Amino acid sequence: MFWKGPVFTKDGFRNRTINLENCEVVEGFDGEEDGIIVPLFRNCHTHLGDTLARDTVPKDLSLEKLVGPDGWKHKWLEKNNIEDSVVAGMKEVIRSGTGLLLDFREGGKEGLSVFDNIEYPGTVILLGRPKNGEELPGKNAGISSLKDVSISADLATAARKKGGLVGIHHSENEREDID
């Protein structure tokens, strides 16, 4: 069985024929194309734990009251089954052809453990955030803002010592000087 059509490469689209049985790829094709092939998408900023929350978000809240430390989102996360929300988000991710995602995980070790029993055919990088003064719960840090520079710096240092990544929300609500 063969597939024929444009394949997106680092040099742009190239017409190719692909033997689906042995994955051999040859230049060009005859006849009509079967479609196009593009690399899997990457989403480097997800919050899969809130997937099911978005349909119930009050419309009249400020950003601070919505996602602040004691905001609506954190109360929602405490009251609801986060695993169900993550599974719903993963189904969307799979349907959209996303092969790599970075997910900001609230809730410390418990927040990271939600992924222990969830299968995903791609790559998930979890950006953990400690709760209640605990240490960085994994090797990667998900920083909510630069407002508290000392805590952010400590988390970034801990992640780097573990060979991890650091993801940060920057200037979502107000201008923050990244320098």
Identify the function of each model-found stretch.
Residues 12-20:
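A conserved glycine-rich beta-strand in the N-terminal activation segment of trypsin-fold
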